[in-house]
């Protein structure tokens, strides 16, 4: 049996560019892609915290150190500059792989900079 699990997440990444007349995709700072373990051209799910839009696209590598999050092509209608996004990548894992599974989570601060990383999401309390 295989399970589809959260592989990586950029939590509350801030859109720096929204380019309608681009081929498509989402450009993400190369440093953040590496930290999260997201590959260039890998499918990603994007959840817009500000307007509730949810869509699928693929990641492309942005200039390292640029702090770019650019939503491109038709997806530019779903996220504008300044919007906060949750960007997720999922993967299939075997039962054996699940024994040591931990996602890569990058938490972004209000200033658009990386705040901290984690391999777990905190338990939600009532």
UniProtKB/Swiss-Prot annotation:
SUPFAM superfamilies: ADC-like (SSF50692). One of its GO terms (biological process) is alanine biosynthetic process. The modification Pyruvic acid (Ser) is found at residue 25. GO terms for cellular component: cytosol. It comes from the Bacteria. Is synthesized initially as an inactive proenzyme, which is activated by self-cleavage at a specific serine bond to produce a beta-subunit with a hydroxyl group at its C-terminus and an alpha-subunit with a pyruvoyl group at its N-terminus. Its EC number is 4.1.1.11. This is Aspartate 1-decarboxylase. The lineage of its organism: Bacteria, Pseudomonadati, Pseudomonadota, Gammaproteobacteria, Pseudomonadales. The gene is panD.
